[in-house]
Amino acid sequence: KKKTLLILLIITILLIGCAPNIFYTNSGVSISTGTPGNGSLENAYQINYKTNNSRYFSPISYFLLGTCYVNSRLYQTIKDSYQECVKTCPGIDFRLMECSTKKGGKVLVHRTHRNGLSADFMVPKIKKGKQIKLYDRIGLWHYLLNFDDSGELSLNKKVTIDFDTMGKHLIALDNAAKKNGLVISKVILKIELKDDFFNTEYGKEIKRRGIYFAQSLSKSINMVHDDHYHVDFKLIK
């Protein structure tokens, strides 16, 4: 009986903690103040947990931690980018990772993500030329995956980063950002992976567009940007 009561108490506490993120409604216009590294967010928009070709990567991050909020313009940008990818990347499922909290400010284990204009995107992965989703389903643990300098997964060398799909998605993000009054201000990807990315057809287009990739990173920052690419945006109007 005591064990049952304890379980019910834990479930109740979890539901209370998750409730604000379960029943949240988007409305109005967001206000982002400051920078991704030192800012805040008002009237945040909650990213969709699932669409026809995308999904938020972790229910714990989404419902309990609440790191699924962005500026209203970025919300529409991400939504539009995935819609474009329905055409440019047919059959591919994408995973969105951590964004900002409801009011911005410090986010656990992140130095930025503070004003609703940053988002992490999971690297798409392929095995024998086809998308593999096995490692997309491990939630927060995905941040701990390691890819070597050529984009091979340390746990399974047959699994590699799909740089072509990544490039198509970044192009879609750039297109959508411009339509929604934003511009991509910075992309962070493990330095050693950039050459393979820019050698692809779509990587070359990204370079032609002048989208800025971080040129140098501290060792600690560099090593954790292999399983995802971080994108900062800036308001332009």
Predicted feature descriptions by range:
Residues 30-96, 162-172, 176-178, 184, ...:
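Active-site acidic/histidine clusters and adjacent loop/turn architecture
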Residues 90-92, 115-119, 225-229:
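Envelope-exposed proteins and targeting segments
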